[in-house]
Amino acid sequence: MTYQKKHQHLRIELASPEQIRNWAERVLPNGEIVGQVTKPYTLHYKTHKPEKDGLFCEKIFGPIKSGICACGKYQGIEKKKENIKFCEQCGVEFIESRIRRYRMGYIKLACSVTHVWYLKRLPSYIANLLAKPLKELESLVYCDLFLARPITKKPTLLKLQGLFKYEDQSWKDIFPRFFSPRGFEVFQNREIATGGDAIQKQLTNLNLQNVINLAHLEWKEFAEQKSTGNEWEDRKIQRRKDLLVRRIKLAKHFIQTNIKPEWMVLSLLPVLPPELRPMIELGEGELITSDLNELYRRVIYRNNTLLDFLARSGSTPGGLVVCQKRLVQEAVDALIDNGIRGQPMKDSHNRPYKSFSDLIEGKEGRFRENLLGKRVDYSGRSVIVVGPFLPLHQCGLPREMAIELFQAFVIRGLIGRNFAPNLRAAKTMIQNKEPIIWKVLQEVMQGHPILLNRAPTLHRLGIQAFQPILVNGRAIHLHPLVCGGFNADFDGDQMAVHIPLSLEAQAEARLLMLSHKNLLSPATGEPISVPSQDMLLGLYILTIENNQGIYGNKYNPSKKYDSKKKFSQIPYFSSYDNVFRALQQKQIYLHSSLWLRWQINLRIITLLNQEGPIEIQYKSFGNSFQIYEHYQLRKNKNQEIISTYICTTAGRILFNQQIEEAIQGTYKASLKQKTFVQKIEKNG
């Protein structure tokens, strides 16, 4: 973790062996250096206490209980680092137990091990820098091949150079006759290398500036060449040019960041703090442990075996040492990225171990779940579906989600109203889904807005407040008009639900963030809650009519059409209710033409040119009917209008009623607001 200009940020880079040692090593007040894990043990099988120098050693990682050493002694914890005390008998410091979450250890490897990320991940950084095929390097890393004269600048006794198989050469039988066992071991380590040692020596021998210069010259030669006319050759040249560009970029990055390429080969293996790879005791002495502990144990077992072989190298066959080096490499590979080479290491239940890469990568890994994005309490997530029956400021919240989000409020309501005596009883009622909890939940939700958010939140309308209502199912119901602000549609989009807890957050949500108060785009000022797509198509179908005016067809055929029967006349209705009743009884249909009695004081919008009546009918008492294309006027003998009828459809009447109710509701709300403001001014 580094700090730059007072902004905290995280930078991931290669660590040198010295840096790994500094992470883990400490000097105790008695001068003893601790930090190296040498034993593959975890907890003692009888006492369940950490084994000394093992993966949970209190001397290395700190005490399990604050202020209590491994002997069981207790001393007060000193806040100043200079005054920290430790037990002279067991070497454990008297400090807080939470240090076990931060303090690291390390394993000193008997042979260098190549970091599998930089070898097997694409692109392979080691293959790019060394300009060698990946398969060739893999054979070298896993000890299938040997490298003669890994350091070419020094004089050599061997005429061999490059890769070869160990058993194919006769020198291994000839040279031991001229050297002592110790001398032959020194000669072999200098002249021949395999495994991570061979890779490390080649990387150490690299001159990065020369790599850049040579790659640049080769790229210029290819750039000056013209097309060969052969598509296969041109592709081959282009791939080579791309490889040279990657090599130049990689070498420049190493130079700029002051990182040495040989650090891609490990000689010290960091051991994570114990709290990040816990071992938990269940009932009856049963233990469960993190997979990392098993992988660390395997590394230590194989590393200690290799140390024993090297300690008695005179009596150990060379092939056995080489085989053990390969096993150490494979154990470290499994710890870092299990299964990257094919078949993963598995436990006794044939389940692959979870390696370090599995813990940090992916959606549920350490970075995406705990660092880049964090799980939030009092929040949920579900798919959205259309809810056209909802007002603009409401949303439908599934019962299952609502009872989980508002559980704390429901529990308080149950206990406060004496429906439950305590917390456990209230939780039991919720788990059993007793009917009373839904009533309490509805009362809690009435005055509590919720926040809906759809990622990515690119502007302030990406998160809006709504008044929740309970709905069945598992999907969130949303009014289609608010989709514009969220840039959402109903093809599987998901939205997050958040509960504002503090009074300030609830007030902000209610006063500023409710959806019906965010109708304009903050960027352009234009309306953003406008009908589109399905809504426009639905409005068109609702308001369309089969015949335009009485010219199209003066009479509509009835459902039971018979050419011999007379056409039924267009029906007359005196109110909206009569129309809806007839529509419900299927006497008329949405697109059926009808005459609706209109209020006399409402103006009828006609064409700009004054329209003349199509027909005028006179009655015996002097009353008259003036029939126009879209309306009728009934007048008395004094030519005063008695009634007005307009030609429309049931669908248009339904649409008009919704518009009227919306306008009246807005008008009433504005009157209430004015009255409220006037009262405040008077009281002020």
From Swiss-Prot:
Binding site for Mg(2+): D489, D491, D493
Keyword Nucleotide-binding: no
Tree of life domain: Eukaryota
Cell compartment(s), UniProt: Plastid, Chloroplast
Keywords, comma-separated and alphabetical: Chloroplast, DNA-directed RNA polymerase, Magnesium, Metal-binding, Nucleotidyltransferase, Plastid, Transcription, Transferase, Zinc
EC number: 2.7.7.6
Enzyme class: transferase
Molecular function (Gene Ontology), one example: DNA-directed RNA polymerase activity
GO cellular component, one term: chloroplast
Oligomeric form and interacting partners: In plastids the minimal PEP RNA polymerase catalytic core is composed of four subunits: alpha, beta, beta', and beta''. When a (nuclear-encoded) sigma factor is associated with the core the holoenzyme is formed, which can initiate transcription.
Family: Belongs to the RNA polymerase beta' chain family. RpoC1 subfamily.
The name this protein goes by in its record: DNA-directed RNA polymerase subunit beta'
Source organism (scientific name): Marchantia polymorpha (Common liverwort)
